[in-house]
Amino acid sequence: MSKKKKILLLSDDMRMSSGIATMSKALVMGTLNEYDWFQVGAAIKHPDKGKVLDLSVDMQKRTGVEDASVKILPWNGYGNADLLRQIMNSEKPDAILHFTDPHYWTWLYDMEHEIRESCPILYYTIWDDLPDPLYNRNYYESCDWLGAISRQTYGIVSRLTSLTDKPTWKPHSDWQVAYVPHGINENEFKPTEVPSDFRNKILAGKEYDFVFFWSNRNIRRKQPSDVIMAFKEFCDKIGKDKA
């Protein structure tokens, strides 16, 4: 059997509960039969900063992949150039995969010429706001491959990486931009029976034809006020007797 490729993952610590962390864990656990993983696990004021944690045995038990290899280096924030050089020298990854807003990675793009001499840079990205963010184009060109989480992102990245307006701009090939939507582990996320005492507590003993559930952080950028306003307008349309 040929030796598995090792991927260096730069993202939120996969043991955390953020969206980035949750999908990082799903991505890693779903590909352990294909790749070995080393993660720089980001968090704010990480309590385990600087301690390399070997999760391989636990991952082997959870996934059934006998040769699963997963290590995490917890860190404050997403790292820096000096840290990356040290890891590349010690771990010798075959590729770097980073994940989250591109503006967190300007230090990475500043050294892309140095990195890409030895391994490619991969980016799992989402950007859903139009018009196309031309200011992101150089970030995208710093990557050898981009996986777009949404169709909107795929369109944006495809258009920007195909531009040739400037002499220094080199368009990406078709294979360098792919649509890779989020998936879920159906063994963990599945319909289930809700205990009647829990349902009664949540709904105050009332019965409804259907119930909306919104799970998110209560912060401004998640726009909870928009959700409340949309729900109010919905209730106004169906009438008080049904709301």
Pin down the residues of each PLM region.
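Carbohydrate-associated surface elements
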Residues: 43, 152, 183
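A short helix/loop element that forms part of the nucleotide-sugar donor recognition site in Leloir-type
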Residues: 163-164, 189-205
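Charged active-site motifs of nucleotide-sugar-dependent glycosyltransferases
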Residues: 4-7, 120, 205-212, 242-243
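Short hydrophobic "strand-cap" motifs at the C-terminus of beta-strands
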Residues: 10-12, 124, 149, 180-183, ...
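Conserved donor-binding/catalytic core segment of Leloir-type glycosyltransferases
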Residues: 9, 205-222, 228-231
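Extended catalytic core of nucleotide-activated donor transferases of GT-like folds
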Residues: 9, 54-145, 151-154
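Nucleotide-sugar-dependent glycosyltransferase donor-binding/catalytic pocket residues
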Residues: 16, 217-221, 235-239
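N-terminal subdomain of nucleotide-sugar transferases
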Residues: 1-57, 91
